[in-house]
C-alpha cells in the first residue's frame, strides 16, 4: 500500500499511527541484529518502517612515503536488502530512503530498479547530509544537488524515462 494512502486512512479514521526508523547495521553485522531490534516493535503495529541510507565515509591511510591515500567506504550499507527482508518477514510497508549525496543518477536508477523488482514502491527522497570530509554538501559529479531533482528522476522513471535517454514501455506492478 502507498504510504500516503496509509496516512490518509489514519486521518479519515481519526486514528493515531506511528512509524519507526531503522539505521542499517554497521558493515559486518547481520540481519539477525536488525530482526532482534524490529521484533518487539512489530507488536506495536507500526504503520510503516523507514530505513535510512547512509553516505559514504572517507578513510585515510598513510603511505610509507608519508602521503595520505583516501578511500571511500560505506559503513552502513544494505538499505535495499534490509527493506526487502523486513517487508517480507513482517508484512509491513517499508520506506527506504534514497539520497542525493554520494550517488550518481545511474546509481540511484539502479537502486530504484532493484526496489521495483523487490516490490518496494515507497521511497523517501532526501538530499542527505554532507560527507564527513566536506565543509558543505557537494553532490556526486553525476548526481543531484537537491532532493527535488531526485524526485523528478523518480517521476521520470515512473513514466519509463531513464537516465541514459532511453524510453521504455513501463508497467507498474
Language model features: what each stretch is:
Residues 1-20, 165-172:
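N-terminal amphipathic alpha-helix/helix-capping segment at the start of soluble metabolic enzymes
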Residues 18-24, 47-51, 94-98, 123-125, ...:
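Hydrophobic faces of well-ordered beta-strands that scaffold small-molecule active sites
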Residues 25, 47-79, 131-139:
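Glycine-rich, proline-tolerant flexible connector loops at the mouths of alpha/beta enzymes
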Residues 45-46, 90, 119-122:
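Glycine-enriched alpha-helix->loop->beta-strand junction motifs that scaffold or abut catalytic
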Residues 104-152:
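Flexible, glycine-rich active-site loops centered on histidine and acidic residues
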